[in-house]
């Protein structure tokens, strides 16, 4: 069956060595080379292939070499129409060179519709005649694919996991680099690609067995477990490929003078032998398979594999035939297996100048930043229509063009790139340089007159304290297109660029067992048995998607609430919380957990499990501690570092109007919780007060003169934030509760609710992170509605205004019957 032949299953389970073959159209967009190969394979279903090899599929490049060719989507359409694929997987290359993110998303949707699962995500070759796009590069593309997979999972119905389409995305890596910066940047970027969602690797073409072995050693040394497919290109003088690679006409590919001369002196059979020897080499050193390219003649392809099978794993006698390095070489590992020492360059004048300027006026930890920002604000430079803005922007553009070849992206990554611009100083204008096209000397393969920007960035990073590790860990997000041609300095200073964060401390709410769909999937997961939280499954993938998407959306804490399971079985909730805390620690990208429960035993279990690891973790949050549980929970601070949400509720009878707690009572509770927390060693910044959200749909006082719940919640926040002692504490609300039972526009209501609460001092919230509260514009009418409820102090006039606005809102959102 075809499902059993998918590349993912073969790489993971097959005892045979996987082979995929790269097929391209001929001159003048000719499909016949692809058709001829596939028909030859179909004639005997691969029975002429060696028994210990399995042909898993075909890969379809997208405009290789930057030259227009048949698009993979069109090739797939013909293959499907003529039923040429049989049991083979179809693995299209998808690149960002010719398409923006909208177009890439459409392509992914089309592949999903066709059932294409395996894809190879690449930056792509720079077009030779057309204008490249490169809105994202390989890391951004992999992130887009991962987001597509997550959305598909999150939209799936419980129990239907077998029908959920998931892309199996691969990425490229080139170990065939001979300068330290080029090589290390390839390995760093490889790690970033894996973090972004790459599930298998395909190497670049190259003929240096030491470099191939070096890649496998690097993966092992760094405990990276991922299938590796070696790229075996049939290099033969029957085609112009050797000459083009030698003459740097195919950037990223290297054929030395010696190799070219050797090829020209050899027969075709000797060319076949070299490809076979390389396959045997990859098989012996631990690769999971090979990608064979440059072969459109099926009998030749079979001959290569048969010869490789004869060699088996005894490839060492052919080392010299697979060793064609550059003249000047850098190898990460010495012959004895030890890692070579990396360079320790000194800062250049440019580095020192950039660091000085950045620290002086652009580092928020230094006074100059705040003085500079206030000065620009004083002159109105934050408004694009002002003359001051235009004058400043003109000066900035001129200066930055002279210094950094600035291209006015408006979303500047100079600090992240150690003072180098990856648009103006890179031929592809990439977010995460380099691309892999550099020559063996480190020059740009697309412009031999300039050194690859990756070389500059690496050398500058190496000159900074911990710079290499920072470079290794840092991934730049795609730039914000709408900021192009605006002032990047103004955008940075006023939080409009990629550094923009929500003004709220976001406590992500999605992992909550009381949410019907989520609770059902949690139950389904738990029913899978003792290894449910470690064995791959649809429900576990769903939970992982919840965790990762919330982390990507800027969560500061990832909340887990399992109280729905603890209603009948408290011990079950305790054990489940331990498992979910592990999952957040594993997949939360360093974001701490918020253990959310009304059961103190669950809180304690989650807190202890969070620290049950040898890895460093950030302090978690407990939600919640009440005044009457403080003496049980707060002593844990001595052993475990954590912050907490102090819920402003009490077991005492309310004394406020209408039998509810007044603002004074709620404020008094906050003061008492604060005093307790100080006794147990908490800082004010580790306390989050929750004055409780009441749905505005039912926020109607039952007696005259009684303030509304929204009024009390907001006024309590005001009191806390204006108190000399409590003002450094945080105020948090469960925002999504405010829109419950409303007929529509719930997200807009939540946005307006947050905006109004922030006016009162709200600085944290249990929220749906995808709504990006505090960053998107609020509807004025909805803000007026929330303002009316926030002002409902018990007077008839305020009550009447709130009810009138609610009536108008319901009338405008009611759906026709």
Can you name each region flagged by the protein language model?
Residues 2-10, 147, 296, 314-396, ...:
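Extended, intrinsically disordered, low-complexity segments
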Residues 3-63:
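N-terminal beta1-alpha1-beta2 module of alpha/beta enzyme domains
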Residues 17-39, 90-102, 167-185, 259-274, ...:
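Active-site mouth loops of central-metabolism enzymes
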Residues 38-61, 193-197, 284, 541-563:
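Catalytic domains of carbohydrate-active enzymes, especially glycoside hydrolases
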Residues 65-304, 313-319, 367-398, 405-412, ...:
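Catalytic alpha/beta core domains of metabolic enzymes, predominantly
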Residues 70-82, 103, 564-614:
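N-terminal active-site wall of soluble small-molecule enzyme domains
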Residues 385-501, 530-533, 540-556, 564-574, ...:
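Metallocofactor- and cofactor-centric catalytic cores in central/energy metabolism, strongly enriched
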Residues 507, 511-517, 521-553, 558-570, ...:
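N-terminal loops that bind phosphate or other acidic moieties
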């Amino acid at each position: 069956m075809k499902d059993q032949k998918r590349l993912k299953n073969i790489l993971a389970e097959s005892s045979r060595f996987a082979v995929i073959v790269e097929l391209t159209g001929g001159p003048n967009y000719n499909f016949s080379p692809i058709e001829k190969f596939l028909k030859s394979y179909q004639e005997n279903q691969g029975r002429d292939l060696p028994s210990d090899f399995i042909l898993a599929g075909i890969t379809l490049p997208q405009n290789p070499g930057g030259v227009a060719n048949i698009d993979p989507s069109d090739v797939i359409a013909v293959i499907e129409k003529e039923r040429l694929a049989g049991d083979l997987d179809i693995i299209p290359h998808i690149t960002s060179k010719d398409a923006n993110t909208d177009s890439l998303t459409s392509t992914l949707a089309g592949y999903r519709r066709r059932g294409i699962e395996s894809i190879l995500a690449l930056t792509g070759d720079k077009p030779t005649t057309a204008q490249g796009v490169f809105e994202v590069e390989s890391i951004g593309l992999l992130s887009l694919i991962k987001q597509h997979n997550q959305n598909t999972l999150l939209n799936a119905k419980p129990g239907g996991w077998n029908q959920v389409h998931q892309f199996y995305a691969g990425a490229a890596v080139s170990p065939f680099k001979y300068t330290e910066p080029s090589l290390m940047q390839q390995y760093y970027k490889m790690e970033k690609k894996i973090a972004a969602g790459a599930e298998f690797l395909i190497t670049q073409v190259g003929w240096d067995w030491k470099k191939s072995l070096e890649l496998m050693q690097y993966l092992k040394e760094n405990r990276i477990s991922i299938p590796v497919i070696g790229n075996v290109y049939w290099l033969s003088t029957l085609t112009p490929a050797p000459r083009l690679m030698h003459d740097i006409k195919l950037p990223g590919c290297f054929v030395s003078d010696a190799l070219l001369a050797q090829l020209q002196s050899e027969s075709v059979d000797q060319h076949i032998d070299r490809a076979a020897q390389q396959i045997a080499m990859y098989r012996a050193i631990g690769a999971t398979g090979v990608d064979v390219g440059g072969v459109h003649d099926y009998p030749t392809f079979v001959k290569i594999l048969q010869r490789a099978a004869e060699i088996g794993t005894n490839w060492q006698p052919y080392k010299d035939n697979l060793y064609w390095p550059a003249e000047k070489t850098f190898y990460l590992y010495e012959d004895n297996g030890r890692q070579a020492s990396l360079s320790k360059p000194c800062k250049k004048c440019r580095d020192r100048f950039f660091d000085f300027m950045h620290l002086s006026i652009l580092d928020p930890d230094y006074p100059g930043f705040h003085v500079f920002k206030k000065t620009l604000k004083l002159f109105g430079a934050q408004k694009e229509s002002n003359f001051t803005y235009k004058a400043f922007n003109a000066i900035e553009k001129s200066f930055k063009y002279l210094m950094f070849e600035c291209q006015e992206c408006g979303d500047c990554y100079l600090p992240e790139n150690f003072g180098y611009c990856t648009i103006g100083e890179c031929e592809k204008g990439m977010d995460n340089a380099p691309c892999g096209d550099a020559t063996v000397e480190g020059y740009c393969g697309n412009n031999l007159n300039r050194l690859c920007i990756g070389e500059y960035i690496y050398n500058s990073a190496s000159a900074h304290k911990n710079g290499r590790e920072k470079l290794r860990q840092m991934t730049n997000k795609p730039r914000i297109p709408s900021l192009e041609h605006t002032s990047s300095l103004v955008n940075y200073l006023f939080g409009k660029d990629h550094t923009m964060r929500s003004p709220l401390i976001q406590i992500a709410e999605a992992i909550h067992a009381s949410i019907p769909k989520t609770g059902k999937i949690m139950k389904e997961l738990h029913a899978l048995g003792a290894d449910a939280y470690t064995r791959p499954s649809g429900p576990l993938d769903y939970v992982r998607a919840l965790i990762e998407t919330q982390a990507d959306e800027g969560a500061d804490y990832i909340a887990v609430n399992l109280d729905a399971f603890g209603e009948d079985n408290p011990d079950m909730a305790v054990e489940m919380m331990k498992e979910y805390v592990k999952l957040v620690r594993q997949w939360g990208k360093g974001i701490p957990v918020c253990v959310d429960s009304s059961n103190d035993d669950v809180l304690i279990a989650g807190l202890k499990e969070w620290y049950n690891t040898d890895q460093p973790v950030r302090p978690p949050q407990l939600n919640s501690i009440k005044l009457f549980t403080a003496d049980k929970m707060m002593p844990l601070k001595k052993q475990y570092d954590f912050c907490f949400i102090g819920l402003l509720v009490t077991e005492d009878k309310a004394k406020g109007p209408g039998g509810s707690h007044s603002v004074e009572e709620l404020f008094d509770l906050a003061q008492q919780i604060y005093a307790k927390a100080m006794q147990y060693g908490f800082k004010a910044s580790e306390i989050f007060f929750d004055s409780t959200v009441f749905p505005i749909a039912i926020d109607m006082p039952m007696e005259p003169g009684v303030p509304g719940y929204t009024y009390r919640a907001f006024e309590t926040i005001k009191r806390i934030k204006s108190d000399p002692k409590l003002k450094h504490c945080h105020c948090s609300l469960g925002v999504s509760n405010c829109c419950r039972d409303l007929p529509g526009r719930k997200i807009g209501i939540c946005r307006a609710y947050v905006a109004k609460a922030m006016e009162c001092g709200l600085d944290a919230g249990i929220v749906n992170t995808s709504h990006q509260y505090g960053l998107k514009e609020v509807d004025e009418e909805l803000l007026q509605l929330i303002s009316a409820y926030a002002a409902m102090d018990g007077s008839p006039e305020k009550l009447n205004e709130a009810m009138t606005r609610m009536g108008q809102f319901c009338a405008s959102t009611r759906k026709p019957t």
